[in-house]
Amino acid sequence: RARVTPSGVTTEFHLANAFAESYDAGNIMGSIEATIELVISNKVDALGLARAHKAGIETRVINHLEFGSREAFDKELTHAIDDKQPDLVVLAGFMRIFTPQFTHHYHGRMLNIHPSLLPKFKGINTHERAIEAEVAEHGASVHFVSSELDGGPMVLQASVSVLSLDSPKVLAARVLVQEHLIYPIAIKWFCEGRLKLQNNAVLMDGQLLPEQGIQFQS
């Protein structure tokens, strides 16, 4: 049982759309024993909502602008999530910073994907920053969510070469291909019980993963 939270127009938004479109009677990609119970966005015009609705998945909008504090917003978000009793919360471009109370509540059962090779380029505008820094490699990272922004324990990373003529848009498109590959893999591992967070360390099949997680080879 998973819940997807898309927000805003970001590259991760396409992931939420891909998840919703690939569901057949609630089963992701036909190979993961899981169902999406609810898709939540904080923006009413989020494309992921329409895609989820088309796939027959329940949706809900919780507008953060209607709340007087981050704590109040997170409390309502928690109520909506817990009503479905999910095993896993999947963030897909949800561009809000959570309170420590929220991240603690879902410790070990909330995943996020970030368009950089963490710990490099946390936050926004990662592709522009990668080009400006003249790095040789860029990519995407799947990690468990913690109270530190884009700083939770690493699960899986995929890299791409940064080419001399790359624009941020071109580089983002190449990274997005890798995002589409590695996020479903990480979700599948979690749903199969192979991927766990224990004492703030990531275990895969009972074995401790390196600090940078598994390096994906396509």
Feature map (PLM): residue ranges:
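N-terminal Rossmann-like dinucleotide-binding module
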Residues: 1-47, 51
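A general structural signal for well-ordered alpha-helical segments in protein cores
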Residues: 16-17, 48-49, 74, 127, ...
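Short amphipathic alpha-helical segments
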Residues: 18-21, 51-53, 101-104, 123-124
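Donor/substrate-binding cores of folate-linked one-carbon enzymes
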Residues: 29, 42, 88, 92-205
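Short, basic/aromatic-enriched C-terminal tail that caps enzymatic domains
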Residues: 199-218
